[in-house]
Amino acid sequence: MRVLILSAFIACATAAPSAPVFGTLTPLTVPYIANIPTISPGDIQAAAIDAKVKVEDALRAAADRNQELLEQAIENQNEKVIEVNDLLKEKSQEAFWSTEDTKWQALTALQTAEAKIDGTLASNADLLGKAVLNGVVVSPVVSRIYSNVIQGVAAADCETPVLKAAEAPEGNKDEGNKDSVQVESSATESESDKAAAGFVRNLEAAQAAAQAQLLSETSAPTADTRAVIAASSEASAAAAPAASLSEASAQSASETGVSAASLSQSPVATPLSAAPLAPLPSSSVPLAGVPASAIAAAPLTAASLIASPLTLPTLNLEQQWVTGPVFVQPGLKAISPISLQTPFVPTLLKTPC
């Protein structure tokens, strides 16, 4: 390149006129250039390598710049995706806990409502009990004996005595062992005798109270009424020991020879055989489960009662039904159910209004 420039400069210098154009012509002399400057191939190759390196550096810098921009874009996109995922996860957790909170609030409200209902039922338990059964459950001692004495006891004032059966110690329930049954029967007989004596005293007191109530509400009783009351008292006194010992007598009947026919020879039957017992008054309300035939049955005599085995009404606590002649007097408070699965002792209780 330098050689070309230098050659052009020399040509221009030699071509320029140094005198007038149409003057004397002088011979042109061209000086001889001994050494023309030249460029070595190494310099040219070095320049080419230098240019190539510069181009490669520029291309590498551009590629690095593009790579950085691409990585930054990818990083920004990843950050946005992570941020969006975190936001969605946070919203999902908020929705979940909001649902759980709503569920617990509903459960708390339900428990509060149940507690209020239970409290209301507990505070109105007496009213609910009276609404279910508004009366006193009177269980006669002897089946199908309906007398004015027991009716008077049930229809007395709020402080009236009420007959209720209390459980005595259980006898032996193993019927497969005869010896153990006999031992338990003898023990039950002694306890039943004591219970029967106490029952007779309580029954006499109840009869006296009922008789006084009847005398205060009605006119003077006639001789027939007094005979009926006396007959009922003696029949109950004779029936209580037999009723409490009926189970033991049935178990040991084959050994002792005692039967219902032998009871008919008792001297108690003689003065009471002609005195029928008074039927149940029409004001009594029978419980559900009591057969109508038992209510409408004809009055029995003391002799027929003594000649037949004495039975007691039973109460099934699981099924809530009553069998036997059990009646309710309206207007009085109900008493608790009575279980007659074991030998029992009727006691005299008072139930306030």
Swiss-Prot record:
It comes from Galleria mellonella. One of its GO terms (molecular function) is structural constituent of cuticle. Transmembrane segments: none annotated. Coiled coil: none annotated. Residues 1-15 form the signal peptide. The keyword Nucleus does not apply. Keywords: Cuticle, Signal. Component of the cuticle of the pupa of Galleria mellonella. Residues 166-195 are annotated as: Disordered. Residues 179-189 have a biased composition (Polar residues). This is Pupal cuticle protein PCP52.
